[in-house]
Each structure stands twice: as C-alpha cells, then as structure tokens.
Amino acid sequence: MWKKVLIAIVFITSFSFAAEVKIRDEVYVEGFRPNYLTGYGIVVGLNGTGDGTTSRYTLISIANMLRKLGIYIDPAQVRTKNAAAVMVTANLPPFAKPGMAIDVQVASIGDAKDIVNGLLIRTPLYGPDGKIYAFAQGPVSTGGGFLESNKGGKVQKGFPTAGIIPNGAIVEEELPFDFNSMTEVTLSLKNPSFSKAQEIVNVINQKYPGLAVVQDPTSIKVRLPQTKNKTEFLAEILDLKIKTDKDNIPTIVFYEKTGTVIMSGDVAIDTPVYVSHGSIYVTVEKTPVISQPPPLSGGQTVVTEGVTTKVQEEKGRIISIESAKLSDLVKALNDLGVSPYDLIAILQAIKAAGKLHAEIKVM
C-alpha cells in the first residue's frame, strides 16, 4: 500500500479588530533592496542520481575543479553519476557586510534525477556587475525526497532537483551605497493605498513635523534632517506604529517544493462559484433559508441566505460544506486527496473569476 500524501495546510487566524504594526512592516525603503547573485557549481555525494555522461559541462567542470586541487584528469574519464551541475542563486540584502551568512537556492541544470542529500562544493556568486560578492557551500536540503512502499517501490514527493542551503553563503564584498550623502528617502508601500500612505505621513509628522509628504498611493517622501544621525532617524521612523485593520488584503502562500499552503482562516468566497478542474467539480452557491414562526405566535416569516459548498470527484464522491469560507473548501479538497498543484490551480481559477479576494503567492 502506498502511503497517502496529504496537503500540508497552515491556517492563520485573522482578527477583525484594529491592531498596531510598525511602519517597517508596511513599506520598503527605496534603494535599500536586495540584489540578485548567481553562480554555477557542482553538487557531489549523490546516490547514483547525478548527471549522465551526455552532460559534458559537468564532466569538464569536475575535471577543472580537480585540476585546481592539483589532480589532472581527462574529462572523458570522469563519471558523474554521483555529481550534478547546478545553478546557485541568492539575495544579497542591503548593507550586508563581509562575513554575513545568507541563504542560497540550488537547482539542477542537467539531467540529474535528484540532488537529495548532496553537498555543494564552494561556488562563487556573482552580482550584475560581474564581481564576486559571496561564496556558497554546504549540504543541500530539498524538502522533498521519496516515500517508499512495503513492496520496495517508491514515489517522488516535491521537487528533489532543487533545494536550499540555509546560511549557505558567506558575504565577501559589500555593495557600494553612500547613505550618509542622501538628503531624502522614499518609502514604498507594499500594498498601495492613499489612506494608508496618509496615515504613515501623519504618524511621522507627529514626531518630526513637516518631514514627510505623500507623493502617490505607493510612495512617501521623507526628508532626512541634517542635525540628526541619519541611520538613527530612519530606524526611529520605521519603528513608529500605525493601526492596521481587517481591510488588509489576505494572502495565500503556496510552497511548490513542499506542497505547503499558508492562508488566513477567514478568507471568504463570493457566491455563486462553479469550477471544473479535471475530475473535480466545485460549486459554491447561496440558497434561501425560510424561518417560519409557529401559528398565532405573532412572529414574522424571515428569509435568509445559506451557503452550500460542494466538492465532487468523478468517481461520485461528494462533500458538502455549509460555508463559503476558503478554509472549509481547502479542507474538503484535502479530504478528497487533491494534490497541492490541483488545489492551487483551483484557487487561482476562483480568483481569476473575481470570487476570491486574496493575494496568491507561489514560491
């Protein structure tokens, strides 16, 4: 019997009352952005699942790597079943200093079956200007792998040809950035809103009058005072608190490699909705509910709207939910054994129809 793989779902409960958040949670500081780093490397230590001999760049790369270590070998004599050529990427955060550790992502570019439990050999990471800004090395965590049956078979889970190395790169060079010469900074809102931008400006100007002004729903200009340490000033305004409420857009995050779905538990679906995806049919619709008072009670008949969600598989199994909450729909789909990829495709279809008011991020 195969082991059943369920979708890992995390529901984060949202509250409708106002709460306070720091300005830094609502904005980006323009210019203070991460920079993409890219490199080419070799993952070794694979269990016979590496690149084949047709991937000549892997053969040549291994021969060149050994040559640097004083070992000279003809690339034609190299066997690559325990090694794989990979692309290595990372985000270099603003103000990163030499010696700082950053996360890296690793992905196979050859015909390797997987890079599970592999070790990335020291790889230089280059910036857009061609300079080396970091070196990456370490064991690769794929978050996938295989599930085995009691008959010796196995089924793939996740994406074993890509993975991450937490804190896997050491910064060697910092980005040139002269913050002290700046006279103003721009705060860019993560979720553009005139009201949110004005609220942020009001909070800043309450502490430092006249320094902040709204430019548009996305950006706020803040003048840097000449009589105060600029780093200290920016840290202070980013730590100021503003109120946030239920009007914030809910977010659904889907991690492809692990099949994990993270969402707000109170996201509602507008009705009616009808979705057909492969062998799965989803309906979310309103039905009238009549409340009839007893005879001679003096009460009045009241008609309200109930919501019914049905999830049906081609085989004939139907699950009904008396709710239009996204969390209930996802649980019903999970009960049917729907894969994470079918799940996110259904949610994207509902959003495209304008019935799901949430941001969907696939990572």
Swiss-Prot record:
Keyword set includes Lipoprotein: no
Keyword Transmembrane: no
GO annotation terms (biological process): bacterial-type flagellum-dependent cell motility
Described purpose of this protein according to its UniProt entry: Assembles around the rod to form the L-ring and probably protects the motor/basal body from shearing forces during rotation.
Family: Belongs to the FlgI family.
Native organism taxonomy: Bacteria, Pseudomonadati, Aquificota, Aquificia, Aquificales
Cystine bridges: none
Annotated signal peptide: 1-18
Subcellular location: Periplasm; Bacterial flagellum basal body
InterPro entries noted in UniProt: Flag_FlgI (IPR001782)
Pfam families in the record: FlgI
The entry's keywords: Bacterial flagellum, Periplasm, Signal
Name of this protein: Flagellar P-ring protein
GO CC terms, sorted: bacterial-type flagellum basal body, distal rod, P ring; outer membrane-bounded periplasmic space
Organism this protein belongs to: Sulfurihydrogenibium sp. (strain YO3AOP1)
Record text on subunit structure and interactions: The basal body constitutes a major portion of the flagellar organelle and consists of four rings (L,P,S, and M) mounted on a central rod.
Listed GO MF terms: structural molecule activity
